[in-house]
Curated annotation (Swiss-Prot):
It comes from the Bacteria. Its EC number is 4.2.1.59, 5.3.3.14. It comes from Histophilus somni (strain 129Pt). Disulfide bonds: none annotated. The active site is at 70. GO terms for biological process: unsaturated fatty acid biosynthetic process. Keywords: Cytoplasm, Fatty acid biosynthesis, Fatty acid metabolism, Isomerase, Lipid biosynthesis, Lipid metabolism, Lyase. Signal peptide: none annotated. GO terms for cellular component: cytoplasm. NCBIfam families: fabA, PRK05174.1. It is found in: Cytoplasm. This is 3-hydroxydecanoyl-[acyl-carrier-protein] dehydratase.
Amino acid sequence: MNKKNSYSYEDLLASGRGELFGEKGPQLPAPSMLMMDRVVEMNEEGGLFNKGYVEAELDINPSLSFFGCHFIGDPVMPGCLGLDAMWQLVGFYLGWIGGQGKGRALGVGEVKFTGQILPTAKKVIYRINMKRVINRKLVMGMADGEVEVDGKVIYTATDLKVGLFQDTSTF
C-alpha cells in the first residue's frame, strides 16, 4: 500500500471494497453509511497528544439519504452518524498504520452534542486526535474527536475506542 497523507472519495470507496489496506485490512463502510467525502490530513506524530491526527470532510447537500427520513418536515443529520464517522476514522487510521483485521467500535467515554447539521449546511469537518495505539496481536486505537459544521464545533467525543479483530464470529 502506498501510505498517503490524504485520500480522495475514490480512495475511500476502495477501502470499502477491501482494496486500500489489503485483503486483511480494515474497511470503511460503503455509501450511504460512509460519512466522509475525503480525508484531508493524516499523520502519525500530530494531534493534541502527538500520537496521530486525522482530519476528514463531508460535503452537505439536501439530497443526503438521512435528510429525507430524519425527520420529515424537520430534516437533521442524526447525531449518531457523526459519532460513527469518528469511529470510522479511528479504524481507518489503524489500517493506515498497518493494522490488520475487521474494525469494530468498542466504546466511547463521553459524547456531547451542542449543535446540529441541517441540509442548509455546507461542510462538516471531523478531527481525530489519537491518544493511544496498540499495534501488536491486539490492534486498538483510542482517540478524542470533534465534529465541526460551517466553522462551529458541535459534537465532541472522548476516548473513542476501535479494535481490529481477525475473527468476529464470536464477537
